[in-house]
Amino acid sequence: MAGGEAGVTLGQPHLSRQDLTTLDVTKLTPLSHEVISRQATINIGTIGHVAHGKSTVVKAISGVHTVRFKNELERNITIKLGYANAKIYQLDDPSCPRPECYRSCGSSMPDEFPTDIPGTKGNFRLVRHVSFVDCPGHDILMATMLNGAAVMDAALLLIAGNESCPQPQTSEHLAAIEIMKLKHILILQNKIDLVKERQAKEQYEQILAFVQGTVAEGAPIIPISAQLKYNIEVVCEYIVKKIPVPPRDFTSEPRLIVIRSFDVNKPGCEVDDLKGGVAGGSILKGVLKVGQETEVRPGIVSKDSEGKLMCKSIFSKIVSLFAEHNDLQYAAPGGLIGVGTKIDPTLCRADRMVGQILGAVGALPEIFTELEISYFLLRRLLGVRTEGDKKAAKVQKLSKNEVLMVNIGSLSTGGRVSAVKADLGKIVLTNPVCTEVGEKIALSRRVEKHWRLIGWGQIRRGVTIKPTVDDD
């Protein structure tokens, strides 16, 4: 924060001012101007097969290149969850035809600016602030995609126009978002500049046949070229018109699901200048404020002398809040938020805190080490290329003592099946997880050296452990 009175944001003076002293959370909405001026309130995931243009679409809408890491740039694939915020504006001149009256910019742009379209007058005004969760499309990275699905409110399904539909990961991702109960989907037929009109129409029919009977049935199909930014304003218009802003809970105790964490200190930094770790994630409910005391669960996990799992919650204080480059005094649900804390940075470096839950002290859910779930298995394996017209392999039933990968919220952990009966199963988790009864979980099994989505479950009950507290 750039100095000044406590509790008032002074960074980015061209954005709406936030004042903690006059904050009344009961009056906030996901479209309150002081909220969407600085942070996104809706999360949109990009899903689809590898190299179909997910990251390029995010760049076309937000101006942010989500591929950040050297090995990602070299191989031109997304490996970690990318993220970018974008503001969507609408021109207040009714004579301007659609879709030209919609425009998108990065999150630090002013909230209104004059029109530059010939023959129109008025200003472009901010109508939505969205956060894109850019998921990897590679089959080895399915776990990362499921972690991203935990925070999505809607999805853009990308299908490249120059390849047949569906590709293996397209169907696997679509199954994953059905599990996560995502209702709002836009289908983008990308790379339209590379194909002739006849091919595009043929593929349009393929897409319609592919989504029939799935959660994406009836979703709008928009032909675009992300590289040439063709039809991107139509995507913006559909985001505003077709994707409702989800109802949010501003008054409960805050809870944030961590999907990234980092140590922001440079090597060789002086001890006095060290900053605490930063956790990045999406607030599920409540409002986080600068200066608030927080707890992170499960926290530090260890084993006692008998090999039993123990957890120690991490307590800290929020030093700063930010959404991309915008300082915040308080952060509302939705959108990806960075939380600067006083936690030892070594606990946060390189995404070590992913899967943890951060919230108000004493108000977080239980920590589970074993889960009893009611589960549902897919009939056939998805995401595997099959020769010719052979059908994919059937999903075998769960067997006792087999090891699965379990995705709960943003945590991927191993789990050993300890008992199975009809559609109920007991799973002993490798890592403890902070979650609640009724939460959805995704199950994956190792097939030919890759983790493959095989089904999902719902937590019915489980074995919990109490976090230990230091005596000092």
Curated annotation (Swiss-Prot):
Quaternary data: eIF2 is a heterotrimer composed of an alpha, a beta and a gamma chain. eIF2 is member of the 43S pre-initiation complex (43S PIC).
The protein, known as: Eukaryotic translation initiation factor 2 subunit 3B
Catalysed conversion reaction: GTP + H2O = GDP + phosphate + H(+)
UniProt keyword terms in alphabetical order: Acetylation, GTP-binding, Hydrolase, Initiation factor, Nucleotide-binding, Phosphoprotein, Protein biosynthesis
Residues the record lists as Phosphoserine modifications: S16
Chain positions covered by the region annotation G4: 190-193
Highest rank taxon of the organism: Eukaryota
Tissue expr: Specifically expressed in testis at the mRNA level.
Function: Member of the eIF2 complex that functions in the early steps of protein synthesis by forming a ternary complex with GTP and initiator tRNA. This complex binds to a 40S ribosomal subunit, followed by mRNA binding to form the 43S pre-initiation complex (43S PIC). Junction of the 60S ribosomal subunit to form the 80S initiation complex is preceded by hydrolysis of the GTP bound to eIF2 and release of an eIF2-GDP binary complex. In order for eIF2 to recycle and catalyze another round of initiation, the GDP bound to eIF2 must exchange with GTP by way of a reaction catalyzed by eIF-2B.
One GO CC annotation: eukaryotic translation initiation factor 2 complex
Residue ranges of domain tr-type G in the record: 39-248
Positions of region (G2): 76-80
Coiled-coil portions: none
GO molecular function: GTP binding; GTPase activity; translation initiation factor activity; tRNA binding
EC number annotated for this UniProt entry: 3.6.5.3
BP GO annotations: formation of translation preinitiation complex
